[in-house]
């Protein structure tokens, strides 16, 4: 027996070589022995021929370690030294010599408060200590790796920096909270890595880092060490303005975008735009069209293109398809400098079963429920988060904070909220488990959503939290202290379904379905609704909006323009999916660019101009937004004219805000001498007319000017005779010189 072998006790050397010794920090590295009278250094370096200990303070050699065995175990005492010091290992390999700062000499970098909040379920910044983070310890720079895997037998970090050797960097286990960590000097930015986990049954699985801030694109799935240099923000003016804005009283016209298919480049459109391309083309386009916000479909890294991002694996990693995290930040910064907000679709309802992802992460159902009646989503064959587990709540809460704080995003739109709220969602009897009170509500998910919204609104000024919720669940946008979920807005799925159904009917039969456009006002003030025509309505065989409308091309385009006019006049914020603003003919295909060539044709140009002018009018006149959620902001003039399929109403603002009158005709009949009530006396004029030749219409209208008469009508003291264009929308307002000059539409 050599002297070196005496440094490994109780078979620890054999256990280490077999991967069975998990408390490696108690064995490897520098340790005091003989009651503090000596120091020993132990290391495990495969293929090493010689190892010397070098002082980091002066670069001098302190000692040479003895080889314990051919497998790569080395150990040795350090002469008379008894006080620990920072050191490197000078390792001689067959073809090279390397100086390696031994990671096993460093203590834990975790603090008690972080660990407590993470386990409790209230950590807002878990990404600062989990994942891969650049740190400096005793003037030594490196990457701190940390992962939650409480049921793993052993966890190692493997990557480019250790030739993917699972024995090289076994991590420190914190048994009490299930975290594993290691601080690695010498790692370079851009290094690829994974966590190598040994399960209790002995199986080994390589997993992507759940907290990775960058990942490879599919089909590869390694995590990537982030860059040290971060984007320098220049959007202070926007952020200050955002914080002072009450968005429920402000205009919000949202352009929904899937970055991979808005435009493409390459000879055959086979290449994605990168973030610089999007800065140069998407932002000016959105600005010109007058939208206030862009809503991005999910950008968290996802392996399957056909999921459109709604089955993410790297929840913290912006997809590498379009560039890195700094590129994404630069895009958002440029949007803000152009006074365009950016919202993000956020998927917290489920996650996919890709083996490198969260599924059975440490050999157990860590993030999901064990019982498939609670843990599996029947529609998408995905897994449902365990919202009752503190660490899972912290994982999701921190992720929401990460996007909003680190990327300056202006809000999140939560996908598939209905599937979170109900335990029996898309399940037959016997396929679900009731809650503790025997009900169908998912109480843990409800509590999580309330906590999420309450914390985000308190911590991050001026953001918008938006729910895609398709049921009649009460109080989605009510405050949490009133037992609501606490969202700022809810998609109005009822209005969307009813109005699109109406749109698809032949004009001659629309009179029998008049209530499909009026019914939404019966419940418009029960929630803070957002009118959304999203990607879901123009895919999976549903056809484009233009395709849904019966008739010849003239009728299709005219009807679509009138529909948009009705939508922009209806109370509630607006969202429109890309391509709909110029009446794309085919339904959306995520593998191809939008059909921009259609803009060579006048009808498509006309719809685009109409949307642009609607947005300009919408942003200019407070009556169209300031009282969206107050009944006094809207009044029907006539909601019962089903015979003519004409809808007329007034939008009001506050104080001296100019009221606007909308008249929408959903048949191809021209109505001349049509009397309409007006909210005040004096001259009125057409602010916008969707039948104008400017938009591809037949130019039926009122010559721009309407003379009000002191004849009460429709509950108004004044009225006028007007011409209502076929399949058209008129927007009327007081004909004051000041307003006309300012509108300049």
Curated annotation (Swiss-Prot):
Going by the entry's taxonomy, the superkingdom of the source organism is recorded as Bacteria
Task: Tell me any Pfam family this protein matches.
Answer: Alpha-amylase
Question: According to its UniProt record, which reaction does this protein catalyse?
Answer: Transfers a segment of a (1->4)-alpha-D-glucan chain to a primary hydroxy group in a similar glucan chain
- GO MF annotation, one: hydrolase activity, hydrolyzing O-glycosyl compounds
**Gene3D superfamilies found in the cross-reference section:** Glycosidases, Golgi alpha-mannosidase II, Immunoglobulins
Q: What GO terms fall under cellular component here?
A: cytoplasm; cytosol
E.C. number(s) listed in UniProt:
2.4.1.18
Q: Where is the active site?
A: 415 (nucleophile), 468 (proton donor)
An individual GO BP term: glycogen biosynthetic process
**Which InterPro entries does the entry mention?**
A-amylase/branching_C, Branching_enzy, GlgB, GlgB_N, GlgB_N_E_set_prok, Glyco_hydro_13_cat_dom, Glyco_hydro_13_N, Glyco_hydro_b
Q: Please provide the record's keywords in A-Z order.
A: Carbohydrate metabolism, Glycogen biosynthesis, Glycogen metabolism, Glycosyltransferase, Transferase
Name the pathway it acts in: Glycan biosynthesis; glycogen biosynthesis
> Which family would the database say this protein is a member of?
Belongs to the glycosyl hydrolase 13 family. GlgB subfamily.
Q: Tell me, how does this one assemble?
A: Monomer.
Family annotation (PANTHER family) = 1,4-ALPHA-GLUCAN-BRANCHING ENZYME (PTHR43651:SF3)
Q: What does this protein do?
A: Catalyzes the formation of the alpha-1,6-glucosidic linkages in glycogen by scission of a 1,4-alpha-linked oligosaccharide from growing alpha-1,4-glucan chains and the subsequent attachment of the oligosaccharide to the alpha-1,6 position.
Q: What is this protein called?
A: 1,4-alpha-glucan branching enzyme GlgB
Origin organism is: Shewanella oneidensis (strain ATCC 700550 / JCM 31522 / CIP 106686 / LMG 19005 / NCIMB 14063 / MR-1)
